[in-house]
Amino acid sequence: MALQLIYGNSGSGKSTYIYEKVIQMAQADRRRNFYVIVPEQFTMQTQRELVCRSENHVIINIDVVSFERLAYRIFDELGIQNTVMEETGKSLILRKIAEEKGRNLTVLRGNIRKMGYINELKSMISELMQYDISVEELGDFLHQLKPDSNLYYKLSDVHTMYAAFEEYLQGQYVTAERVLDVLAEAVDDSKLLQDAVFVFDGFTGFTPVQMKLLHRCMHVVKDMYVTVTLDVREDPLADHGIQDLFYMSRKMTATLLRAAQEEAYIVEEPVFLPVGANSRLAQSPVLAHLEQNLFRVRSHRYEENCGEALRIYSLATPREELRFAAWKLSHLMREKNYRYHEYAIVCGDVECYEKYAKSVFELYDIPYFVDTKTDRKSVV
């Protein structure tokens, strides 16, 4: 049983390396289960990559799953039945609790009927669950605050609502944030996970609930492989503070190594993938230079002309930015014979641009997909 970390710059081929490796291992050991665990939005693309790379385009003992899909796979195996409360249900229950506990609330009492307030409260409670902060731990934190501070009163109301919400769920429902807790308790009973191989790709870090699951899996899973985005010139164990470009990668490394040490899980020598001719940016020297030097302490100027590889435009509003991007896409489709699936529009605030996407892209007849979760609209 061993943990191995695969380090490399963005575009250096970490995914390619680990996909080729897991395909070879799966072909050599048909009786072992291999789980490639990726963020939810990458599952279909990863399946496609593995199928295309596999011999005869078939993967028999390799499953591509997210954490949540892995949980339901094991629940099906063990016959575990859980009624998962959806987002609309959470809002309804919190509304009911707010009505019942109204007299005990101080700050929230006057705001609870405002549009969107229940959703904000729901989001906060969901985040507390996701980061494994229990009602008791929140209560302990309250005792450390000054009783006359605004933060104390606000968190006191949140604590009241959180405790009542947990009490309502007890024995009846489980939230999406607690699905991994249920899975962690079932890991030892699963035959699918016994001596399996886990491959984690596309993660920048793990939440405490996910780490709790990994701790339990280290007792039953044969090997774990984790890809980490890190400049190979950097020391993965160095601590340069939160302002460091690769802070999250280093934090994930430290968390995994600490977990392996606590569970007596062997740590193999890491793999460092150099930036070479097969890297994603090899055909674009401008972008390759940018990747190597952007936000680095010791950066170098690109002495040649950037050509068409990099252009900076300034527009007045997000809508105008999106219209320009749509026009540029249409132009490249006609002039360069590119395909829509070869493009991505990356933005810092997806919600801000999402509200203009429908009208702009339909105007230019461009098919599109917005990478956000769409919840059912609450009626409360």
Positions of the model-derived regions?
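Conserved helicase core region in the C-terminal RecA-like lobe
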Residues: 63-69, 197-206, 210, 225, ...
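Helicase P-loop NTPase motor core
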Residues: 2-3, 10-32, 40, 187-189, ...
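A short acidic, amphipathic alpha-helical/loop segment
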Residues: 21, 50, 210-216, 356-360
